[in-house]
A protein has these predicted regions:
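Hydrophobic alpha-helical motif in two-component signaling modules
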Residues: 41, 50, 64-65, 74
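Acidic, metal-coordinating helix/loop segments flanking the phosphotransfer/catalytic sites
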Residues: 30-48, 56
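His-Asp phosphorelay/catalytic-motif detector in bacterial-type signaling
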Residues: 45-47, 73-78
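Receiver (REC) domain switch-region micro-motif
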Residues: 4, 49, 68
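Two-component/phosphorelay signaling modules centered on CheY-like receiver
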Residues: 10-30
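Conserved phosphotransfer microenvironments
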Residues: 52-68
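Alpha4 helix (beta4-alpha4-beta5 surface) of REC/receiver domains from two-component response regulators
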Residues: 59-63, 83-114
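Non-catalytic signal-transmission and effector/linker regions of two-component phosphorelay proteins
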Residues: 1-11, 106-122
């Protein structure tokens, strides 16, 4: 089964994203902090990473994206940002994300569309 790393500190949103991933046929691993996203991605080699832009931790959200992009073994795994930021702001901050999910209105149809945009087959 394909795996998805979900980087989200809010337990409610993490559960919602986990449910969306399961409906899309993806197994999930939850990472509550930025450094956990990087470590778990190195371990499980997911097909996609969905993470909060402002994820807490010793490596925060945007720093985690940069760390993922700097690692040759995992740099090609698409990252979808889940954030309160507007999509234009996300694109301006980090041009290397594959998609964006807008909080607080997280809908399954948007989740599916973000996966397709990221090139993830479901």
């Amino acid at each position: 089964m394909k795996t998805c790393v979900i980087g989200e500190a809010d337990p409610f949103i993490a559960r919602l994203l986990k449910r969306f991933a399961a409906e899309s046929g993806l197994q999930t691993v939850i990472a509550p902090a930025g450094q956990d996203v990087v470590e778990l991605t190195r371990q499980v080699k997911p097909v996609v990473i969905i993470m909060e832009a402002e994820l807490p931790g010793t490596i925060r959200g945007w720093e985690a994206v940069r760390a993922l992009r700097a690692d040759r073994e995992i740099c090609n795994i698409p990252v979808i940002i889940c954030s309160w930021l507007q999509e234009a702001n996300v694109d301006a901050l980090v041009g290397e994300v594959a998609g964006h999910l807008q909080k607080p209105e997280l809908l399954y149809t948007d989740f599916e569309a973000a996966l397709r945009k990221a090139g993830v087959e479901i």
